[in-house]
Amino acid sequence: MTALPPLSPLSDCYGYDRGTPADRPYIDAFLAARQAGIHGDGAEVKDSTYLTSYGAHRLASITIIDIDPGNAAATLRADLAAPGSLPAAAFDVIILTQVLQLLADPAAALDNCARALRPGGTLLLTVPCLGRISPSAAGCDRWRWTPAGLTALMAAWPGPAEITAHGNAATCVAAILGAAREDLPAETDLSDDPRFPLIACAAATRAGQPAR
């Protein structure tokens, strides 16, 4: 009989204390493949990690959005799900990685992002297909999406949206156990198995012609 993994997780914080969380290589690959769209005026939630990593030399400005008054790095205090909380037509790119599951009304947040993007602007979104309950925001951790579920959620987006899914059985198990990428054997296959997605992603463009 194959030995089952331990019931206790290896990490209680997604594997950050052990190395790179299991979902991060997929998030990095998704953003790296679409980094040409990270330019102009950009916005990201909580910090500017991905904006600066993948678009620093193409960005004119960075806005850090957070509802948390304790985040000194935030430059815009806003509830993404509150209509009108983001300025209209203010951004060329918005990056939302692993945020939507913490919002009371994900559809309202997407509407808000669409309104905040200029025509031709890009939303780069990732959401969990599975994962532990947030250790820091358990009361707000409401949602998980299959690729089909994210496709349905994005159906009202005003423009084209490409939905992709990434992960496999090994990385899904690693994520649940709190194992880091560094805990996995070096030969672990990071290819995608559509039966076992760890994250779902959307690259969505706001309809209309960019201003010249």
Which residues make up each language-model segment?
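Short conserved AdoMet
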Residues: A36, A104, R118, A155
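A short glycine-rich, Lys/Arg-flanked "PGG" loop and its adjoining helix->strand segment in the class I
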Residues: A107-T122
